[in-house]
UniProtKB/Swiss-Prot annotation:
Binding site for ATP: L231, I267, S341, G342
Gene designation per UniProt: ASN3
UniProt xrefs under Gene3D superfamilies: Glutamine Phosphoribosylpyrophosphate, subunit 1, domain 1, HUPs
GO terms for biological process, alphabetical: L-asparagine biosynthetic process
UniProt keywords, alphabetically: Amino-acid biosynthesis, Asparagine biosynthesis, ATP-binding, Glutamine amidotransferase, Ligase, Nucleotide-binding
Protein name (Swiss-Prot/TrEMBL): Asparagine synthetase [glutamine-hydrolyzing] 3
Catalytic activity: L-aspartate + L-glutamine + ATP + H2O = L-asparagine + L-glutamate + AMP + diphosphate + H(+)
Positions of the UniProt region annotated as Disordered: 555-578
Site (Important for beta-aspartyl-AMP intermediate formation): E343
Residues reported to bind L-glutamine: R50, L51, A52, I53, V54, N75, G76, E77, D98
Superkingdom classification of source: Eukaryota
């Protein structure tokens, strides 16, 4: 990941303005510590802080077309850049950067080229021939981008809010799958997949199509000129990413440079579920595994930094971002600059434990659509900013455009959790990789119950956060929360504590409006809380709030014969239909 900042039409091309742009861009340097670039044309500025992943020697930005009339600053990876270059043979490329194709595609197709890009990206392009500009963000919002407006009529774009929040009174998250055009005067959606309408699909489930499409998604993301690894918690999603990556690593260009030994990383409190499961999967796959330990106090000490970098006060995001933030620092110290991660699967397949209570396939499917549309405010935000805080790039194969289209076209009846048929959450994905002849994973890992990252690193992590917040937020403070924070009022002491820290860094009303709100249980949307009347009394984003579902649910007996464990064993015995 890199950091980008663009200021366009600011009616000021003075040296003081240039210095201010450099100062603001420096706030993003953690995202791209390898090099800095700045393009100035009259009163337009494109700044770039580079994390060199592809073509480290010559791919510095901003990037240009042949005569430099088109300049572009990009944060992202374009996985199909070689195929796109094949159709641009009349153009002269200056670098081997995957992002340079953007300038030349614009020359060929004007603004209608964004859908050709297969990757994660946020970019701003300036056409100096008529001083027009466009900005665009990838389909799901894997890559962060904000848009703001200066009092002088200027338009601002930045990878993180901290680069524009002081100079813009009005700003917001740039919506995923959209393009901003100065010629057309606003935003429009470029990404319009069939599932976006939330109409219930009817395509029969084909496990081999699911498997093959996911494998292609992982292979694409092995495009790198620097050392990389996989974040391996031992859960289904990260384990599948690691397993598939390992199978194809030997054939990749990355193996020629860095060897075919896959590095995997896991973090947790001492004795946590993730450490145990991650070690077991790493041993099974034969990876070079790195276990990182932290204490509750280590996490608490990092909370302020986490909120500053991740730019949110959402409880579940902060809980999960903190261990990921700590792990990323260690990963960077080992010389690794890119990691593969398992975000997105739970949204696509209904993997969160509250999906057990989905009343029918229509509501199940609509909830998965809502979850995917909101990913840029939650898991994408966490995965990107927690790692980018230390100059590490996270790639997410489950959020591949083609894979999402395949998975979201499946009749949701197949995704429904059916104890009577031995189908636990994400059975569609588990079954697709249940290969008896050439196993991807051990059965008990393939059918391990979902653990949210903030739970899996150790249950005492969340309990410790709550205890810490209770010491800093009194009952009186919480009772008066609606007066202190009338917008998106915190409902718990933990939420209040995070909000006070956030407001210290980002005091403007526009900043707090970038953070989502509303009731949630076990990471549900507000709409899904209606599925179980009991949930309204236990609004906690932890998976343990899914009473009657999680094997370690709050206030429930943790016995060996609990119903979810029985269901897991039944699922392991259910014959695969691959």
């Amino acid at each position: 990941m890199c950091g980008i900042l663009a200021v366009l039409g600011c009616v000021d091309n003075s040296q003081a303005k240039r210095s201010r742009i450099i100062e603001l861009s420096r706030r993003l340097r953690h995202r791209g510590p390898d090099w800095s670039g700045l393009h100035c044309y009259e009163d337009c500025y494109l700044a770039h802080e580079r994390l060199a992943i592809v073509d480290p020697t010559s791919g510095d930005q901003p990037l240009y077309n042949e005569d430099k009339t088109i300049a572009v600053t990009v944060n992202g990876e374009i996985y199909n850049h070689k195929a796109l270059r094949e159709n641009l043979k009349s153009h002269q490329f200056r670098t081997g950067s995957d992002c340079e194709v953007i300038a030349h595609l614009y020359e060929e197709h004007g603004e209608e080229f964004v859908d050709m890009l297969d990757g994660m990206f946020a970019f701003v392009l300036l056409d100096t021939r008529d001083k027009s500009f466009i900005a665009a963000r990838d389909a799901i919002g894997i890559t962060p981008l904000y848009i703001g407006w200066g009092l002088d009529g200027s338009v601002w774009f930045a990878s993180e809010m901290k680069a524009l929040s002081d100079d813009c009174e009005q700003f917001m998250c740039f919506p995923p799958g959209h393009i901003y055009s100065s010629k057309q005067g606003g935003l429009r959606r470029w990404y319009n997949p069939p599932w976006f309408s939330e109409v219930v699909p009817s395509t029969p489930y084909d496990p081999l199509v699911v498997r093959n499409t996911f494998e292609k998604a992982v292979i694409k993301r092995l495009m790198t000129d620097v050392p990389f690894g996989v974040l391996l918690s031992g859960g289904l999603d990260s384990s599948l990413v690691a397993s598939v990556a390992l199978r194809h690593l030997e054939k990749s260009e990355a193996a020629c440079q860095w060897g075919s030994k896959l590095h995997t990383f896991c973090i947790g409190l001492k004795g946590s579920p993730d450490l145990k499961a991650g070690r077991e999967v790493a041993d099974y796959l034969g990876t070079r595994h790195h276990e990182l330990h932290f204490t509750v106090q280590d996490g608490i000490d990092a909370i302020e930094e986490v909120i500053y970098h991740v730019e949110t006060y959402d409880v579940t995001t902060i809980r999960a971002s903190t261990p990921m933030f700590l792990m990323s620092r260690k990963i960077k110290s080992l010389g690794v600059k890119m990691v593969l991660s398992g975000e997105g699967s739970d949204e696509i397949f209904g993997g969160y434990l509250y999906f057990h209570k989905a009343p029918n396939k229509k509501e199940f499917h609509e909830e998965t659509c809502r979850k995917i549309k909101a990913l840029h405010q939650y898991d994408c935000l966490r995965a990107n900013k927690s790692t980018s805080a230390w100059g590490v790039e996270a790639r997410v194969p489950f959020l591949d455009k083609e894979f999402i289209n395949v998975a979201m076209s499946i009749d949701p009846e197949w995704k429904m959790i059916r104890p009577d048929l031995g189908r636990i959450e994400k059975w569609v994905l588990r079954n697709a990789f249940d290969d008896e002849k050439n196993p991807y994973l051990p059965k008990h890992i393939l059918y391990r119950q979902k653990e949210q990252f903030s739970d899996g690193v150790g249950y005492s992590w969340i309990d410790g956060l709550k205890d810490h917040a209770n010491k800093h937020v009194s009952e009186t403070m919480l009772m008066n929360a609606s007066f202190v924070f009338p917008d998106n009022t915190p409902l718990t002491k933990e939420a209040y504590y995070y909000r006070t820290i956030f407001e210290k860094f980002f005091p403007k009303s526009a900043a707090r409006a970038t953070v989502p709100g509303g009731p949630s249980v076990a990471c549900s949307t507000a709409k899904a809380v209606e599925w179980d009347a009991a949930w309204s009394q236990n609004l906690d984003p932890s998976g343990r709030a899914a009473l009657g579902v999680h094997v370690s649910a709050y206030g429930e007996d943790k016995t060996e014969d609990s119903r979810p464990e029985k269901l897991q064993k039944l699922a392991e015995k259910t014959p695969a239909i691959v």
